[in-house]
């Protein structure tokens, strides 16, 4: 049986019904080499603070539900292990989002941004009786990396521009738009570029690159945004040269 140790975890809590501002609470949690932060939060809720609020679902870094700040770095709780934080751990709600309660944030703008870029195949008239819509490996390679997003919101918590401008559609939405724009089956690029070319689109990004650094799926949203800027520049150049 693995040897159990104890770790003091600072959880920044907030209940809008009784608190005027977030405050810290400290909990002593037993752990071994396999204990994740999500396990620790479950222990706290079951044994120490039944009213602690946080999101979780799959426990396997697939659903993206358990994003939070760990020592000021956006992380998934299920992929964060206490063994790596023997000097202490501070857990907070994701940065740059309004806090609903404790570690739960309001993702409304995030979801609306994803919806706004129309994340689905547009203008493909192929029917089921025509068979599968086959792509070559090269065609799939253009967008495959950008299709791995799990909508966890870590890139928004990492993005300094989203922190300054909450209307910025953000890394995940731009990446998703680029994913579909690069899909050979899709014909909706013109519709999405209206969003990417807008004031709160790709040009709000100053290319810090922290969004790619914290991405748990190595999607590289920073690269997608820069490629989006290239496409936006093409649109601008064509519009400039087109006869009026």
UniProtKB/Swiss-Prot annotation:
Enzyme Commission (EC) number: 1.3.5.1
Amino-acid positions noted as binding [4Fe-4S] cluster in the UniProt annotation, renumbered to this chain: 149, 152, 155, 215
Keyword Metal-binding part of the UniProt annotation: yes
Positions contributing to [3Fe-4S] cluster binding: 159, 205, 211
InterPro entries according to UniProt: 2Fe-2S_ferredoxin-like_sf, 2Fe-2S_ferredoxin-type, 2Fe2S_fd_BS, 4Fe4S_Fe-S-bd, 4Fe4S_Fe_S_CS, Beta-grasp_dom_sf, Helical_ferredxn, Succ_DH/fum_Rdtase_Fe-S
Stretches assigned to the 2Fe-2S ferredoxin-type domain: 16-97
Organism domain of life: Bacteria
GO molecular function: 2 iron, 2 sulfur cluster binding; 3 iron, 4 sulfur cluster binding; 4 iron, 4 sulfur cluster binding; electron transfer activity; iron-sulfur cluster binding; metal ion binding; succinate dehydrogenase (quinone) activity
One Pfam family cited in the UniProt record for this chain: Fer4_10
Membrane disposition: Peripheral membrane protein
Binding, [2Fe-2S] cluster: 58, 63, 66, 78
Cofactor: [2Fe-2S] cluster; [3Fe-4S] cluster; [4Fe-4S] cluster
Ranges for domain 4Fe-4S ferredoxin-type: 140-169
One GO process term, biological-process aspect: fermentation
Keywords: 2Fe-2S, 3Fe-4S, 4Fe-4S, Cell inner membrane, Cell membrane, Electron transport, Iron, Iron-sulfur, Membrane, Metal-binding, Oxidoreductase, Transport, Tricarboxylic acid cycle
Location of this chain's protein in the cell: Cell inner membrane
Reaction(s) this enzyme catalyzes, per UniProt: a quinone + succinate = fumarate + a quinol; a menaquinone + succinate = a menaquinol + fumarate
Complex formation: Part of an enzyme complex containing four subunits: a flavoprotein (FrdA), an iron-sulfur protein (FrdB), and two hydrophobic anchor proteins (FrdC and FrdD).
Job description of the protein: Two distinct, membrane-bound, FAD-containing enzymes are responsible for the catalysis of fumarate and succinate interconversion; fumarate reductase is used during anaerobic growth, and succinate dehydrogenase is used during aerobic growth. The QFR enzyme complex binds 2 quinones in or near the membrane; 1 near the [3Fe-4S] cluster (QP is proximal to the [3Fe-4S] cluster, on the cytoplasmic side of the membrane) while QD (the distal cluster) is on the other side of the membrane. It is not clear if both of the quinol-binding sites are functionally relevant.
Protein name: Fumarate reductase iron-sulfur subunit
Organism: Escherichia coli (strain K12)
